[in-house]
Amino acid sequence: MRTPARSTLGILALGVVAALAVGEGLVRLAARWSPTVRDLAVPRGEREPRAFASLEAYLASQPTQVVPHRNWFNYWNNALGLNDVEFAVPKPPGRFRILALGDSFTYGLVPYPHTAMTLLEARLGAVCPGTDLDVLNFGIGGTGVRDYRTIVTLGLATYDPDLVLINFYAGNDAPNVYQYVHERSRFRTVLGVSRLWMLGRNAIRLWQGVHDLGAGRAPAATDTPRGLVPRGGTPVDPGRHVSEQDPALTGPIFTETAFAAIQTEEIRRFYLPENPAVVDRAWRPVLGDLEAIRTEVFRRGRRLALAVYPSALQVYPAQRAALVETLRRRPRYAALSIDALDPTLPNRQLAVYCQRAAIPCVDLTPVFIEASRSSAEPLYKQRDAHWTIRGNRVAADAEAAFLAGLVCSSGSQAPNVAPR
């Protein structure tokens, strides 16, 4: 009796293994052809670079993030699917153009008039009188430094910027250093490379409330009237006003469980191992992509600048401490201590690189810390990593003060800007 039972169990186990193997193969195959599956199944840092024939082809590979003429908080996205006005091509003679790269912080999870890049353009126009300028917002949610490199390679010739601005979000553009130290066991390695596991985990997170752009409860889309061609940056319904107190602009956005998962992924970027070589190894791919961007920009005779956008975990020590206390209840993070974290780690790595590469850089973290102390008005949405309208204002003011010296043709300097 035992032999048939064992045989049955063996057959069942073999069937399960075979099913998992087939599933793994199908997911890997689907990830090659489907951008949506690839985004869910392949960690961003492990996605193989893809060759694109054009910038349009690259944008088409981001269908969940780049939606032409999308209604975004009652303002149209442009024809490329970016949160900006329509771009003038070719660039008008005499215009100073900035091409801004970044993720959802640059894209802006607020209405178009309130995004940091829209405000940056207005601020620079005010402090650089007589300068014809524009800021092209190429922020795309869910992207990283490797994507910024792709956009530079494919877009510089068409849009002809005088200055390329990289908006580096320390919360997820920085590498996951914690993983390099504490997740090298065989079991975790198997799960880490399994695309089937990653797809299932991320699909569940999406079902629980983690949305592509994190703009939960954004105002519903409105159909385009027949015969009307939408123009980026213009109101969908001029008679409709989206209140600054709309829950989609203030939060809470995510469930507590989903937001804890987001913050956990961010805090791992601030882990400081005892061996400095681990940090260097983790940062090598990121710095390699930044160097490739610098090389391409300089080859075309253009200028490059970098701004560091802080995570809320860097701005609010209490949030950082509370998250560590929560994580320590899990066996996976039982040994984690607040002393093992250095919230300035990404900033210091970038400062060293910028100095070595002779790139002008600004770290917005001190500005946000000061702004958090000067007013109780939130800089970040509740249960979301993204900025409120005030956070976008603070970022725009700081970047304008930084960039004025690079942009103003008359040599006029930006005024001192108090925290907003």
Where are these regions (language model features)?
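Second-shell loop/turn segments in exported
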Residues: 104-110, 137-138, 279-283, 337-340, ...
